[in-house]
Amino acid sequence: MPFVFPVFRGDPVGRLRLSAGLWVYDGLSAFRNIARHRSWGHRTTLRHEPQLRADGLRGAMHYYDCWTDDARLTLETVQAAVGEGAVACNHLGVTELLRDGGHLSGARVTDRVTGASFTIAARQFVNATGPWLDRVRRLDEPEGKPVLRLTKGVHIMVPRDRVGNRNAIVLRAPRDGRVMFAIPWEDQTMIGTTDTDYEARPEDVAADADDVRYLLDAVNAYFPAA
């Protein structure tokens, strides 16, 4: 996917420094990406992104990065594992971790659909539960200290023709200078992400009005007609 990183008067990082970093980025792909990064001037940038704010625009860096459908990628990974002999079970919640001779030997799980409970025995365990990692750890170590610092990342979706971006755009939030993106997603533009501390239950996470305003302020600063 093509990305455009606009540079405006007063930005903390100019095109020269961005180019130096993007040479490293190109090198990480062994220079086998679709194309190497390019530096655009004011006119070229507006030719490619005519809805971008012209006032104070110095130019932009153009480069390529990868994108994926995260849900599809996850399902494909599970299906590939099953194809190699793994057993995949959905809608199971771990309620107890079992030990035998001081070592983990199994997990007590409950089917969230039927309510049935049963035990799964194993020799090796991987706690890949994302933001619920500490909750699962405490089934085995009730007094264990948290190892995660939870943060909330919010995206919003708006009609792409409302924003007017043709490429993925790198944005800096006016409020704190944080880097985020406006990414084309079919006929929508996905704007985000935020990154704020979060202390409630992961399953209760939701965007609030301040999150939405933070993201809208960022995209409006770059696309005034939006």
Regions found by a protein language model. Name each.
Residues 39, 88, 119:
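Short aromatic/basic micro-patch
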Residues 1-48:
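Dinucleotide-binding Rossmann-like beta1-alpha1 core, especially the glycine-rich loop
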Residues 1, 96, 119-120, 127-226:
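Active-site substrate-recognition segment that forms the wall
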Residues 26, 46-84, 104-108, 116, ...:
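Helix-loop-beta segment of a Rossmann-like dinucleotide-binding subdomain
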Residues 90-105:
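A conserved short coil-to-beta-strand element within the FAD-binding core of flavoproteins
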